[in-house]
Regions:
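Bacterial Sec-exported substrate-binding components of ABC uptake systems
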Residues: 2-41, 138-168, 282-286
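Short secondary-structure boundary segments
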Residues: 39, 95-96, 117, 219, ...
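Short helix-initiation/N-cap motifs at beta->coil->alpha
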Residues: 19-23, 71-81, 200-209
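A short, structured surface patch at a secondary-structure boundary
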Residues: 34-86, 90-95, 195
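Proline-aspartate-enriched helix->loop->beta-strand connector
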Residues: 79-93, 110, 208-225
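Structured C-terminal subdomain patch of bacterial secreted/periplasmic proteins
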Residues: 123-135, 139, 224-286
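Extracytoplasmic ligand-binding site segments that recognize negatively charged/polar headgroups
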Residues: 100, 116-130, 162-186, 230-231
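Alpha-helical, coiled-coil/dimerization segments enriched in small aliphatic residues
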Residues: 60-64, 176-204
């Protein structure tokens, strides 16, 4: 089994070997003190589990824990060179990150633990539990708050009798959140039909404006601002309401376009259930 080598950057004290989410054996400190979480959701989880003093650096994307993040002075990019500058004893990354970047870090003896990106609420809880174990931290409060959110969502949805609404998740890239996506899992808790899934779209597909017209949803959910670095402007309710081609769509005619916080709805951290509460309140508002 290939580990990360016995000598590691910034590692002091006892270490042990663990197998990460991709099956790679990684030597990690028993009590990591220079953690670098990569990606906004990883930061959400890590900075909610441990004191910011144990976090060596964070990235540059907006996360859901700005106060804790402000206590972390260093900012890094997900490259070996950038990582070496902060001497981490544990780097946590999701498996959607470039294998080349991960390989490069490992070649530099940086201990990288890769976790499998969750696509459901239950998988998100499992990842939080996995990271908590790695950091010797308790995830009890975080999981309890997610469960409380899910209970709130269930209570709101159960008060609604009659036809379940058809909901579309629409971003500046088009109709999204198809079958197998995180949003698709959320719709099961919200007790709504998913427009993108009904049209046969998958987790990474983007449907067109024509698809939105064809779906004719009762409700359209749009993220407040999407994670975008290419300067594309996020979709807005005003833009949809004023589009002549969309006037026949039920959600437009009935003014049922709702905004949800993108850093919550697009996360797979404990904040995803906050987005679900917000969506439930909007979907079932009179």
């Amino acid at each position: 089994v290939v580990g990360c080598g016995p000598t590691q950057t910034g590692t002091t004290g006892a270490t042990h070997q663990v197998t990460d989410g991709t099956g790679v054996a990684v030597t990690v400190p028993s009590e990591p003190k220079r953690i670098v979480p990569i990606a906004a959701s990883t930061e959400d989880i890590v900075l909610s589990l441990v004191d910011p003093s144990r976090v060596a650096a964070v990235g540059t994307v907006v996360n859901n824990v700005p106060e804790a993040s402000a206590k972390v002075e260093k900012h890094v990019k997900a490259t070996a060179e950038s990582m070496l500058s902060v001497q981490p004893d544990l780097v946590l990354v999701p498996n959607w990150m470039s294998p080349d970047a991960i390989g490069e870090m490992r070649n530099m003896q940086i201990p990288v633990y890769v976790y499998k990106t969750p696509t459901t609420v239950e998988e998100a809880k499992a990842v939080i539990h996995e990271i908590a174990g790695l950091l010797h931290a308790s995830d009890e409060t975080m999981i309890a708050s997610m469960d409380a959110d899910l209970k709130t969502v269930e209570d709101i949805a159960n008060k609604h009798s009659g036809e379940r609404p058809l909901v579309a998740f629409y971003t500046q890239f088009g109709l999204t959140g198809g079958k197998g996506s995180t949003f698709d899992d959320m719709t099961k808790y919200l007790k709504v039909h998913n427009a993108a899934a009904q049209l046969g779209l998958g987790p990474f597909d983007n449907g067109t404006r024509e698809d939105l017209i064809k779906a004719n949803p009762d409700i359209i959910i749009i993220p407040s601002v999407a994670y975008t670095s290419d300067g594309t402007t996020p979709a807005t309710a005003e833009q949809l309401y004023s589009d002549p081609a969309l006037q026949g769509v039920k959600a437009i005619a009935n003014r049922r376009v709702f905004l949800v916080d993108s850093s919550q709805v697009m996360s797979y951290s404990q904040f995803m259930t906050r987005a679900m509460v917000s969506m439930a309140q909007n979907i079932y508002s009179k």
